[in-house]
Amino acid sequence: MKHIADLRKSYESGELDEAFAADTPLLQFDTWLQQALSAGLPEPNAMTVATVSADGRPSTRVVLIKGYDSRGIVWYTNYKSRKGQELAGNPFAALQFHWVTQERVVRIEGRVEKTSAEESDAYYDSRPLDSRLGAWASPQSQPIGSRAVLVANAARTAAQYGLHPPRPPHWGGYRLVPDRWEFWQGRKSRLHDRLVYRLVDGTWLRERLAP
C-alpha cells in the first residue's frame, strides 16, 4: 500500500500573471468559473463554506453556488442548519472553490447577509418539486431516527400542498459580500502563483503573495 506521505503531483497546467489578471476579482472569478464550466469539470459550481460558532469552533460543508454579481456570492439553505445558526451568531464566512483538473483554487472572505424574500421565493419556485418538498421534509442538522422520517415528512408535505408547496420560512438564500479574494494557480516546483484582492476604502487592491 502506498503511503499517503509519498503522494506527489507536479503542477504545470497554467500560470497566473499580474499582466493578464483582471482588474477586479469578480471578473477574474467569472473568467475562471466559465473556463471550468467549458472544460466540463465535475460540479464546478461546488464550493466549501466555512463558518465559525460563537465559541470559536469552525465547521465546513460543500454547497452549490447559485448566483454571483457585484453584490456577492449566493447560495440557498436551511436557516436552522448548523451553518445558519453559526451565521446568525457570527456573520463572517469564507468560501473556497477547488478546480482540481485546472490546478486552481479561489478563496473568498466576507460578511454574510440573507437574500431578500423575493430572491429566495424566485429561486425556490424554480426548483424541481422533489427539492421543494425536501426543504420542508428535512430538519437539517438535527438528529432523526431513520430515513423513513424524511420520506414520511415529504409525503405529508406533498399531501398538504400538492404541486405547489410554498417556500418554508426557515429556508432561503445567503449572500457573502466579499472583502477579500485569493486566486491560486499551481505551478512547477511548488512555486505557485497567488494573487489576492483586498477591498480598501471601496477600491480593490491587488498584490502577489508568496506561495
From Swiss-Prot:
Its cofactor is FMN. One of its GO terms (biological process) is pyridoxine biosynthetic process. It comes from the Bacteria. Pathway: Cofactor metabolism; pyridoxal 5'-phosphate salvage; pyridoxal 5'-phosphate from pyridoxamine 5'-phosphate: step 1/1; Cofactor metabolism; pyridoxal 5'-phosphate salvage; pyridoxal 5'-phosphate from pyridoxine 5'-phosphate: step 1/1. Pfam families: PNP_phzG_C, PNPOx_N. Its EC number is 1.4.3.5. The keyword Flavoprotein applies. It catalyses: pyridoxamine 5'-phosphate + O2 + H2O = pyridoxal 5'-phosphate + H2O2 + NH4(+); pyridoxine 5'-phosphate + O2 = pyridoxal 5'-phosphate + H2O2. It is an enzyme of class 1 (oxidoreductase). FMN binds at residues 61-66, 76-77, 82-83, 140-141, 184, 194. PROSITE patterns: PYRIDOX_OXIDASE. Homodimer. HAMAP family: PdxH (MF_01629). This is Pyridoxine/pyridoxamine 5'-phosphate oxidase. The lineage of its organism: Bacteria, Pseudomonadati, Pseudomonadota, Betaproteobacteria, Burkholderiales.
